[in-house]
Structures are given as C-alpha cells and as structure tokens.
C-alpha cells in the first residue's frame, strides 16, 4: 500500500468515525445518550461502564461535547490510578517495586496534567476562545497514553509486572485515552487543523523576542562552573533554583562552563522555559552511569531527564557511561513539549536517547549508540544531525530507532531529515561484520521516516529489522518510509517487503514528516534563532 493509499485509509477511518458520531440531527437529549456515543468509539465497554457508574453528566449534543466528557472520564480514572499507586507505596519495602512506583506516580501525575491541559484548552469558559488547537490536544492526549505505557514498561524492566499491572489495568485508563484520541482525531480531520498555540503573527505566546539574542550572546541568570567561578558547581543546583521561581514567564538561562559534570539532572514538571548553554559539545559534558541492570527503570536511568515545557539545550554533551554490557542505559530523556536540542552530543549504547513524548526538534546533534538508541513516542524531527552506530556486543546487531507508537491516532513518530548515518570510530574497523538497521517496531503502529539523508555502508541492504528475528509483530501496521536518500546504502532494491514499508516517490507525501508539518515548527521555532528548514 503506497503512501497515498495509507493516508486515504487513515482519513477514511477518521471520516467514518465522524459520520457515525455526527450524521444524525441531535435536537433533543432523547435522540441520543452516552451509550450510543460510546458504541462508536474504539473501546465502547470502558466508556459505557464509566458513564453508567457516574451520574451527573449532561448528555452531549455534539461531538465536541462528547470529547469533553471522554477527557473528563479519562482524567477521573487517572486520578484514581495515581491515588492507588501512592497508597500501594506506603508499605512497600522492595527496592525494585519502589523504583517502578516512583516512576508510575510521576507519569500518572503528568497524565493528569496533560488531560487537564487538554480539557481547559478545548472547553474554554463561555465566550472565550479555545486556548489550544486540536493538533495541540492530539499531542497532549498522545503523551497521556504514552505515560501509561511507560509505567507498564518500567514494571517489565525490573520484573515486577505482577505488582503494578493489577493497579493500572483495573482503571482501563489506556482505553479511555484511546477513545479521546479517536474522537479528537475525528474533529482534527474534520477541519479544525491548527498547529500549535500561537499569537496572531504565527508565533507561540511563550517565546519572547529575547530568545534569539540569547543564542548569540548568552546573558545567564545563573552560571555553573566546576572551578568555583560560578554561582554553583553542579548543574542540578542551578536547575533547582530556577524551579523555585515564583513567576516562570520568560526564559531562564543557565550557563554551564566547560568541564565534566558527573551527575544526573532532572528538569521537573512546571520548571518551564529553562535554557542550558554549554561551551560546546566537546567542552561541557554531563555524564552518569545508571542502567536497568543497576536497578533503575529505563525511564529513570537517564543522565538527563527533561520534563518542563519549552526546554532548550545548546552546546552540551549528555552521556551515559554504563557501557554496552549493562543493557538499557539512557543518556537523555525528553518529555518536554516544544523542546530543542542544538549542537548537542548524546552518547551511550543501548537506549541512548529516549524521545519519550511531546514535540521535539534536534538540529546539528551527534547521537551515538548500539541497540534501539533513538526510541520513544514523541513527535521528533532530527535535522542536519550525525547518527553514529557504535560497536555492539559480540553477536549483537545495531538498531538505530525503536519508535513506540501504540495507537493509530497518536500524532507521533521519528523523522530523520537531511542527516548522515555513519559508523562511529569504534565500529569502522569491523563495520562489515556488524548488521545495522534503521529501525524496528517497538510498538504495533511504530512510525519512522528517513528523508534526504546520507546512508553510509554501515546500513544493512534490507534497511529495517523485525522486533525479533522471525516475528511478524507490527509489520503490517507500522509505517516505515524512505525518501530520496543518498549514499552507498541508499538503494531500496533489497529493502524489506513488509506491507508497512514505503518508498516515497512524491514530495507531497514526504513533506508530511518535515519540521513545518510534523511538529508545527514554523509556529514556534523562528524566534528561538535556531536554524531550521521548514520543508524538504
């Protein structure tokens, strides 16, 4: 099925849902009730169950009202799940269970925030305009669903699924959020096509005119220096001070002087508009060594975890030194909406870069790794980047991406544009003995595209790999595509023959995965001063 056919199929699904929900006149409450609406969602049973057991809802008369009800239902279930998780932790003494619980409590807290953000954005007070577009809402709902999956995966990392699964499964939260995605997706397809929250000039309201100047001449609010010449000698100390701001409007710049900072940093939720500026990727290095084998979840193994909105990093290396034998070990995890990484190096082995959720842009970055070293479920674009597979363990293959799209209505995926895929120095001597693939399907609807990128002979002729050798998981439902790549490995003659793999022939098909369309970059990147190409 070519790209156009798949786009038409997705459009058809949206339109069928829209027609089923909206075609009949809705003049009175008696014409339709919540059960009828629920029947038209992907998961009607948890929808019906919730509304049956919760009185006080006004019957919806249009699709947008039903969306609000679904988001309210999902948020109610998320609040209940988080409370139960918190309760379960009171008497928990097992270190692995404690680690998973800590992640899940945070993740469900963020899910509540994303659902609340959506609710307030799409259902403004009487007379007020919507404060977000349906595109924004789809991003936040996608994040809410990703959070629940990350919680579940964390319990699998540390083999405590029997402890976590009963708590989070009983709420049916994932199915309720999937229903929200389907209905909001129908509204988005119907014509409410915004890109992101913006003012009348097309720029987001959170960006100030100072941002562009900040990249040219840094005027730091705080300075971090190993030699004691700054305000602090650790990066986290400066981040914590920024997090205590009473007013968070405007960019808060932290200048991190050259040096190796051995610490794990976290920019928490609500610590927004942080900008970390280093002295260059070879000079300012933040490094840690956490790993799953060391008792951490993949999510919490990150040397740097970024959650606050609108984060920018420039000229910094994020490194995980756990090594190839320690399994999953993240150098950088971003869950920050509208985040930017410019001229940064992200270095590790397995699971180097977790593009966890939300909209992200990487420009002129270096990414090193072995197995699934760019993974997660953000809408992430890598432009003018250098992707460097390293030498893996004996018998291992390299896999560049493992994209985690779990629902066909999530507006997520990985786009690699105008970049280069080359062997890292340690792989060069043995490059002919190690297979390297551009991606494999971590989840059923995995989506990765490689556009106008130079593929050195490090890339296997087949291009892509199943999740496990011989497995057919996701091969019909994933979306992997290539468009006008160059280099020794760019020929698609020997590529996989899966139903979900596409060689794009038209610019109009490929442009759906560019900065301008995939992450709505023209609405929020210009005033940062970060260079970018909007289209192909």
Curated annotation (Swiss-Prot):
Its EC number is 3.1.1.11. One of its GO terms (molecular function) is enzyme inhibitor activity. Acts in the modification of cell walls via demethylesterification of cell wall pectin. SUPFAM superfamilies: Pectin lyase-like, Plant invertase/pectin methylesterase inhibitor. Disulfide bonds join 365-385. The PMEI region may act as an autoinhibitory domain and prevent untimely PME activity during transport. Residues 31-183 are annotated as: Pectinesterase inhibitor 59. InterPro entries: Invertase/methylesterase_inhib (IPR035513), Pectin_lyas_fold (IPR012334), Pectin_lyase_fold/virulence (IPR011050), Pectinesterase_Asp_AS (IPR033131), Pectinesterase_cat (IPR000070), Pectinesterase_inhib_dom (IPR006501), Pectinesterase_Tyr_AS (IPR018040). The record marks 350 as: Transition state stabilizer. In the N-terminal section; belongs to the PMEI family. The active site is at 351 (proton donor), 372 (nucleophile). Residues 221-522 are annotated as: Pectinesterase 59. It comes from Arabidopsis thaliana. The keyword ATP-binding does not apply. Expressed in siliques. It comes from the Eukaryota. GO terms for biological process: cell wall modification; pectin catabolic process. Its main location: secreted. Keywords: Aspartyl esterase, Cell wall, Cell wall biogenesis/degradation, Disulfide bond, Glycoprotein, Hydrolase, Secreted, Signal. NCBIfam families: PME_inhib (TIGR01614). Glycans are attached at residues 33, 91, 116, 159, 195. This is Probable pectinesterase/pectinesterase inhibitor 59. Substrate binds at residues 298, 328, 440, 442.
């Amino acid at each position: 099925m070519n790209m156009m056919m798949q786009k038409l199929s997705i459009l058809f699904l949206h339109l069928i849902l829209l027609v089923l929900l909206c075609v009949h006149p809705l003049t009175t409450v008696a014409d339709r009730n919540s059960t009828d609406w629920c029947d038209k969602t992907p998961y009607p049973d948890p929808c019906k169950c919730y509304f049956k057991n919760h009185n006080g809802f006004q019957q919806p008369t249009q699709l947008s009202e039903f969306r609000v009800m679904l988001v309210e239902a999902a948020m109610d279930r998320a609040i209940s799940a988080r409370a139960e998780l918190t309760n379960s932790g009171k008497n928990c003494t097992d270190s692995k269970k404690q680690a998973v619980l800590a992640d899940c409590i945070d993740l469900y807290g963020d899910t509540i925030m994303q659902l609340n953000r959506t609710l307030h954005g799409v259902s403004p007070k009487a007379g007020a305009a919507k404060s977000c577009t349906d595109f924004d809402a789809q991003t936040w709902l996608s994040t809410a669903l990703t959070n629940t999956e990350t919680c579940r995966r964390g319990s699998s990392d540390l083999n405590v699924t029997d402890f976590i699964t009963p708590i989070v499964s009983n709420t049916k939260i994932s199915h309720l959020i999937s229903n929200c995605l389907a209905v909001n997706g129908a509204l988005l397809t119907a014509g409410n096509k915004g890109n992101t929250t913006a003012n009348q000039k097309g720029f987001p309201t959170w960006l100030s005119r100072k941002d562009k100047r900040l990249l040219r001449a840094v005027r730091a609010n705080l300075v971090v220096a190993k030699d004691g010449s700054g305000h602090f000698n650790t990066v986290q100390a400066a981040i914590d001070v920024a997090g205590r701001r009473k007013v968070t409007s405007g960019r808060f710049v932290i200048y991190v002087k050259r040096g190796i900072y051995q610490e794990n940093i976290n920019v928490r939720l609500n610590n927004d508009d942080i900008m970390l500026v280093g002295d260059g990727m070879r000079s300012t290095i933040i490094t840690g060594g956490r790993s799953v084998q060391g008792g951490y979840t993949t999510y919490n193994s990150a040397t740097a975890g970024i959650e606050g909105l609108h984060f920018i990093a420039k000229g910094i290396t994020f490194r995980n030194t756990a090594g190839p034998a320690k399994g999953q070990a993240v150098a950088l995890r971003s869950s920050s909406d509208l985040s930017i990484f410019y001229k940064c190096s992200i270095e590790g082995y397995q699971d180097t870069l977790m593009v966890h959720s939300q909209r992200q842009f990487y420009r002129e970055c270096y990414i090193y790794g072995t197995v699934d070293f760019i993974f997660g479920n953000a809408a992430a674009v890598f432009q003018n980047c250098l992707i460097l597979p390293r030498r893996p363990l004996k018998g291992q293959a390299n896999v560049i991406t493992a994209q985690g799209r779990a629902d066909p209505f999530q507006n997520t995926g990985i786009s690699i544009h105008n970049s280069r895929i080359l062997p890292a120095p340690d792989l060069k001597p043995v490059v002919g003995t190690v297979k390297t693939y551009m991606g494999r399907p971590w989840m059923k609807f995995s989506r990765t595209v490689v556009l106008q990128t130079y593929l050195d002979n490090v890339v296997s002729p087949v291009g892509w790999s199943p999740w496990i050798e011989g497995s057919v998981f996701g091969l019909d439902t994933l979306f992997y595509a290539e468009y006008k790549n160059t280099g020794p490995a760019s020929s698609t003659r020997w590529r996989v023959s899966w139903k979900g793999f596409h060689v794009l022939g038209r610019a109009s098909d490929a442009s759906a995965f560019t900065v301008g369309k995939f992450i709505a970059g023209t609405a929020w990147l210009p005033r940062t001063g970060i260079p970018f190409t909007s289209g192909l």
